[in-house]
UniProtKB/Swiss-Prot annotation:
<keyword id="KW-0479">Metal-binding</keyword>
<dbReference type="GO" id="GO:0004239">
    <property type="term" value="F:initiator methionyl aminopeptidase activity"/>
</dbReference>
<feature type="binding site">
    <location>
        <position position="233"/>
    </location>
    <ligand>
        <name>a divalent metal cation 1</name>
    </ligand>
</feature>
<dbReference type="GO" id="GO:0006508">
    <property type="term" value="P:proteolysis"/>
</dbReference>
<dbReference type="InterPro" id="IPR036005">
    <property type="entry name" value="Creatinase/aminopeptidase-like"/>
</dbReference>
<feature type="binding site">
    <location>
        <position position="202"/>
    </location>
    <ligand>
        <name>a divalent metal cation 2</name>
    </ligand>
</feature>
<feature type="binding site">
    <location>
        <position position="233"/>
    </location>
    <ligand>
        <name>a divalent metal cation 2</name>
    </ligand>
</feature>
<feature type="binding site">
    <location>
        <position position="105"/>
    </location>
    <ligand>
        <name>a divalent metal cation 1</name>
    </ligand>
</feature>
<keyword id="KW-0031">Aminopeptidase</keyword>
<feature type="binding site">
    <location>
        <position position="176"/>
    </location>
    <ligand>
        <name>substrate</name>
    </ligand>
</feature>
<dbReference type="InterPro" id="IPR000994">
    <property type="entry name" value="Pept_M24"/>
</dbReference>
<keyword id="KW-0645">Protease</keyword>
<feature type="binding site">
    <location>
        <position position="77"/>
    </location>
    <ligand>
        <name>substrate</name>
    </ligand>
</feature>
<dbReference type="GO" id="GO:0070006">
    <property type="term" value="F:metalloaminopeptidase activity"/>
</dbReference>
<feature type="binding site">
    <location>
        <position position="94"/>
    </location>
    <ligand>
        <name>a divalent metal cation 1</name>
    </ligand>
</feature>
<comment type="subunit">
    <text>Monomer.</text>
</comment>
<feature type="binding site">
    <location>
        <position position="105"/>
    </location>
    <ligand>
        <name>a divalent metal cation 2</name>
    </ligand>
</feature>
Amino acid sequence: MVYLKSAREVEQIRQACKIFQEAKAYFTIERLLGKSLTAIDQALKQFIESKGATCAFHKYQNFPGFNCLSLNETVIHGIADNRVFGVKDKLTLDIGINLNGYICDAAFTVLGPKAPEPMQTLLEVTEACFTAVVEPQLRPNNPTGNVSHAIQTYFESKGYYLLKQFGGHGCGIKVHEEPLILNYGKPDTGTKLEPGMVLCIEPMVMTDSDAMVMHNNSWNVLTPKSRYNCHVEQMYVITTSGFECLTN
């Protein structure tokens, strides 16, 4: 069942999302480069707690970390460890924030200064998809399948592959709510968008294959047949006239 948020609830979720925006602005390449994933996770935790919030992912479905830190071959759900973010690396920071019971779930990807050019291009294309194809679909009465199909068409037209086993979702009161919004789909199918829906849209993109495997830690999702991958996640609320992006 889809839970529609009231204006008051949307404002509380908006405040949680502001902490994400502040974290994204604070954790620049200079602050991340040369640090272990564990150190980054702890620094993120301290930053979030300094804003009066908590880490929404910690212990959620028994997740052991505080945030999902996905380095290189890990596309999503990475558990922090002692590996170091280096000059040629990709790192996705998927941050869950619980502010007084209201949730922000959003992610951004950063690259070391010597990251390969194909990885740079992939990140640019992924970031651009939100304004290019996602946001034009975010309006009342438009079915979620149109959002999914727009994402699929956009990336496949550029020769990329999409992770099929995971997708976007409702959010705001719980980390994961209905509806599920996959990154592929058929037009005019799924749940119709309504004002008050809060949605996470999160393309997970690979350069060479849509194959994935689970790490033996049961969390890290790996892309062994793809040289590069990328994950970016934004949160939106559907309004009577269209949408508001809560995280950008």
